[in-house]
């Protein structure tokens, strides 16, 4: 009993104070430029309006630090008995498969301690898996193992409403014939990360969540983390929703215990996931070599790229390195994008499954926060676009053919169709090549509910031969 009292005094009280401080900061962070905040707010609100998703909780990292947290919409929809409850930053959402990067980090921590190597065969730690003496830990963390996915469906099957242990998942899916030869294909598979989580437990001798808490969550101050694999979120958190086809939103069913182990079990606030992003940017949990392994695109045996590292998607965003991942479990969809070299991250957590609102908001917000300046070609295209929305064009920019094209009728059509759209969320160049002695460029113009494609041809003297807009395919 004395030991318990000492623990309560020395651990729980400071932890409680940390919780209170963290929740307060999550609620009050607004250190972002007002104009930038307005753009992010507009993106989030318009995407929610267009998609019908009830709510989004957003956290923004700039210059390596959290500068903005905000929540939009309703965390709980109104019923006959209760009013709608607005979303607030303190509410937790399930982050789904974003959890995988925490599992990958646990493995890399164990490698740093000399307790395993990511090039070890999985059978060294978990005997009995199909071709476990050949498939490596690196291959399970990069989805190149060949182990069949136990949950490819985008809904909760009846069987998943009942408890299932990690060992039962491995016995059922980890002992099937591989879908392909290890290292020869990329195929997303939740089974891989159940295997990885079991390896963490086997090597450490402690529960997976305990290891993450001691080595990641507690050091980073991520005090809101919740194990959704063992218990559903509380009434103070966001309610998960889904719908059948175009029907009404309904409270989503909860997966049974065990199904999300190590592959999608974490829930937290957007603020706390942004704390994790701060650590990725600062490289504060792992050694530099481990982050290099995590962020490096894994290649197949034939040299083909996979756009995947270890537990993370690895993308090029207009010449900027993006480390990202989405997540979906019953009633929740999330997106976490980190422009790692720019010190920028966008966390978006939403409470409706099967809808891409989270990814749309994150992918629109991140480059805005990074402040990528428009190229001269983009700037010119944007200025012409704004003029066309007002029914005018600067003919000094146009070659004779294009000047002839923009008749009063054409200008009227451009104005009547583009003006109601207002300012686009983003406007950027996607392609450039030389053709017919001119420079061809393609641009993507993004609105919450639609995308447009602009194509131009420019002569060496700078005169425009084409400026055409059509719906993007």
What are these model-predicted stretches?
Residues 324-325, 335-352, 454-455, 464-470:
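Short, well-ordered beta-strand elements
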Residues 432-473:
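Exposed beta-sheet edge and beta->alpha loop/turn motif
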Residues 11-22:
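Bacterial N-terminal signal peptides
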Residues 348-410, 472:
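Short, gly/Ser/Thr-rich active-site loops of penicillin-recognizing serine hydrolases
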Residues 70, 74-76, 133-330, 335, ...:
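Short, surface-exposed loop or secondary-structure junction motifs
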Residues 392-437:
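Short solvent-exposed beta->alpha transition segments
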Residues 29-93, 115-120, 175, 320:
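Short, conserved catalytic-motif segment at the N-terminal edge
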Residues 49-57, 79-140, 178-191, 261-264, ...:
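Short active-site loop at a secondary-structure junction
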């Amino acid at each position: 009993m004395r030991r318990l009292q000492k623990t309560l005094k020395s651990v729980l009280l400071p932890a409680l104070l940390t919780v209170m401080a963290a929740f307060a900061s999550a609620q009050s962070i607004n250190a972002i430029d007002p104009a930038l905040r307005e753009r992010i707010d507009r993106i989030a609100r318009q995407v929610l309006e267009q998609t019908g998703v009830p709510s989004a909780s957003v956290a923004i990292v700039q210059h390596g630090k959290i500068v903005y947290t905000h929540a939009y919409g309703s965390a709980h929809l109104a019923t006959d008995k209760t009013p709608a409850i607005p979303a607030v930053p303190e509410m937790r959402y399930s982050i789904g498969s974003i959890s995988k990067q925490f599992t990958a980090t646990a493995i890399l921590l164990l490698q740093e301690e000399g307790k395993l190597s990511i090039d070890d065969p999985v059978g060294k730690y978990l005997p009995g898996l199909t071709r476990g003496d050949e498939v490596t830990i690196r291959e399970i963390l990069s989805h190149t193992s060949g182990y069949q996915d136990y949950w490819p469906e985008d809904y909760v099957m009846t069987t998943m409403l009942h408890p299932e242990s990690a060992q039962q998942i491995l016995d059922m899916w980890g002992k099937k014939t591989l879908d392909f030869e290890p290292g020869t294909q990329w195929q997303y598979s939740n089974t891989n990360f159940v295997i990885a989580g079991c390896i963490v437990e086997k090597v450490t001798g402690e529960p997976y969540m305990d290891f993450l808490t001691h080595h990641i969550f507690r050091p980073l101050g991520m005090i809101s983390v919740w194990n959704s694999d063992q218990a559903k979120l509380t009434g103070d958190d966001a309610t998960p929703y889904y719908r059948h086809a175009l029907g009404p939103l309904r409270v989503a069913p909860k997966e049974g215990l065990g199904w999300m182990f190590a592959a999608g079990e974490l829930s937290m606030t957007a603020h706390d996931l942004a704390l994790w992003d701060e650590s990725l940017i600062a490289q504060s949990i792992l050694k530099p070599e481990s982050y290099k392994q995590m962020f490096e695109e894994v290649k197949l045996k034939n040299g083909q790229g996979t756009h995947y590292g270890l537990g993370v998607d690895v993308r090029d965003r207009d010449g900027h390195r993006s480390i990202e991942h989405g997540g979906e479990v019953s009633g929740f969809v999330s997106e976490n994008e980190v422009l790692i070299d720019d010190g920028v991250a966008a966390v978006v957590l939403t409470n409706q499954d099967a809808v891409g609102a989270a990814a749309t908001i994150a992918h629109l917000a991140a480059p805005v926060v990074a402040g990528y300046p428009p190229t001269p070609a983009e700037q010119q295209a944007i200025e012409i676009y704004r003029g066309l929305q007002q029914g005018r064009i600067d003919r000094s920019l146009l070659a004779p053919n294009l000047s002839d094209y923009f008749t009063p009728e054409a200008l009227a059509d451009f104005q009547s169709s583009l003006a109601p759209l207002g300012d686009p969320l983003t406007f950027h160049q996607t392609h450039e090549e030389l053709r017919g002695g001119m420079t061809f460029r393609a641009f993507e113009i993004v609105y919450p509910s639609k995308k447009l494609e602009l194509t131009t041809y420019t002569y060496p003297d700078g005169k425009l031969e084409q400026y055409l807009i059509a719906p993007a395919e």
